[in-house]
Amino acid sequence: MTTFTKLSEQEAPSLSVHPTRRISKINPNIYAGFTEHMGRCIYGGIYDPGNPLSDENGFRKDVLEALKELNIPVVRYPGGNFMATYHWIDGVGPKDQRPARPELAWLGTETNQFGTDEFLKWCEVLGTEPYFCLNFGTGTLDEALAWVEYCNGTRDTYYANLRRKNGREEPYNVKYWALGNETWGPWQVEQMTKEAYAHKAYQWAKALKLLDPSLVLVLCGQDGTASWDYYTLKQCLLPLNSPLSTSAVPLIDMHSIHLYTASSDHRANATAPLAAERAIEITSSLIDLARIENGVPADQLRPTICFDEWNVWDPIRAEGSKGAEECYTLSDALAVAVYLNVFVRKSKDLGMCCIAQSVNVISPLMTTKDGITKQTTWWPLYLFSRYMRGWTISAHLSCSTYEGETSPKWVRGVKDTPWLDVSATLGEDGYVNLAVVNVHDDKGIETQLEGPSGEVSVFTVTGDNVNVTNMKGKQEVGIVESTWDGKGKYVFPKHSFTLLRWKA
């Protein structure tokens, strides 16, 4: 939690950090990933059989090693929009017997050479948990139940035995399951009204929890600010009515929201993720309102927010049907850092956040047949995932604000947009971690910093200007490490992300 006091341009900025004031435990799942059958994310991304850089499973070893640096706790799969016409049964069993299918989300052909077992094996190699999305387009409840049985079944039943026949004796114990993806969108196969979706989601959730009460089910929301979000929460956050249920076990565990931001103007681009903060606040209130109106018992666990698609994405410059391969700038890296600050500040409400996506498609990590490139956006993600864990702690910022146009425009009316964007954590190792983005592209901001009592480790991500990239054969943006004595004022460089660490 960071409180804020708005100053004039003439007043001196200050920042205080209070490690004894713990706000909330940070769920490690806010650093989750996402791999969709889209563009080169799967084929030519995480899976590239025949490439000398791949292992015996066809998994790109360089990609695995890079992703291990991020300590990713969960990876969402297989979509995304792709999911609306995907049938999991096509992607299991002998590969020479798997059918190729037309793919309607991104207008390609799905070979099904990489499916459920391959993905779950990849997760085990990476050391992460899977998060599956169910087909709410052309799929059926029977198909969804069969998939859960295939993954998690322990009894002598058909789909559990099919898994065993395919070479996996022990269950995979897949915990996280989404009830569809963006079913409200006009681009979806089988787009639904909020009324139709809420009815279907509730009925599916009942059946899925009867089959496996340990499942964590995610309701499909919109952007957290829409009537869709309120209606679906109101209809689905109901007291359970089943002889197998208890009041402490909810039917719906998380509510999903999505947001992509982008602007050609740096200042609007870097402050745009503040829209995510307001969306989280509104969604949290809608969850509480639905529970209050429905009379949900206080001892029934409160659902959290699953922000399972977020990133900088301009679909004009990086079209989805052409693989959505963004060339990220320093400005985009600062926007990603602001997103991550938001997630730390709002950790109390968040059960998961998935950057979209993990490889090649609007991704911080790009592959060629010969190697990988870490884009500008990789570096703030790496620093946050490595250090910004443990507890969100109190901080107070006083500085002036950016007063120009925001993207989306409604942010201007609901959020302050300070030149500095801040979050702070206390790690299990006893270190304070302070993340600061200086959005200003013209000047460094000298700030009176209260909190450090000794030497401070400093990690700085910046570049020559806000438009530099790492995709032109040179790493223009990376991490510069230094130290500071922790006394007095610190100058946050123009257009930079800075992480400061000191012993509490």
Swiss-Prot record:
What EC number(s) is this enzyme filed under? Answer: 3.2.1.55
List the catalysed reactions. Answer: Hydrolysis of terminal non-reducing alpha-L-arabinofuranoside residues in alpha-L-arabinosides
Q: Which UniProt keywords apply?
A: Carbohydrate metabolism, Glycoprotein, Glycosidase, Hydrolase, Polysaccharide degradation, Secreted, Signal
User: Could you say which enzyme class this protein belongs to?
Assistant: hydrolase
Give the sugar-modified residues: N152, N181, N269, N467
InterPro entries cross-referenced by the UniProt entry: Alpha-L-AF_C, Glyco_hydro_b, Glycoside_hydrolase_SF
- State the pathway, as annotated in the record: Glycan metabolism; L-arabinan degradation
Q: Say which domain of life the source belongs to.
A: Eukaryota
Family matches, as SUPFAM superfamilies: (Trans)glycosidases, Glycosyl hydrolase domain
Recorded GO molecular functions are: alpha-L-arabinofuranosidase activity
- Subcellular location, in the record's words? Secreted
The UniProt entry's GO biological process terms, in alphabetical order, are: arabinan catabolic process; L-arabinose metabolic process
Q: Which Pfam families match?
A: Alpha-L-AF_C
Q: Which Gene3D superfamilies match?
A: Glycosidases, Golgi alpha-mannosidase II
Describe the task this protein carries out.
Alpha-L-arabinofuranosidase involved in the degradation of arabinoxylan, a major component of plant hemicellulose. Acts only on small linear 1,5-alpha-linked L-arabinofuranosyl oligosaccharides.
What is this protein's record name?
Answer: Probable alpha-L-arabinofuranosidase C
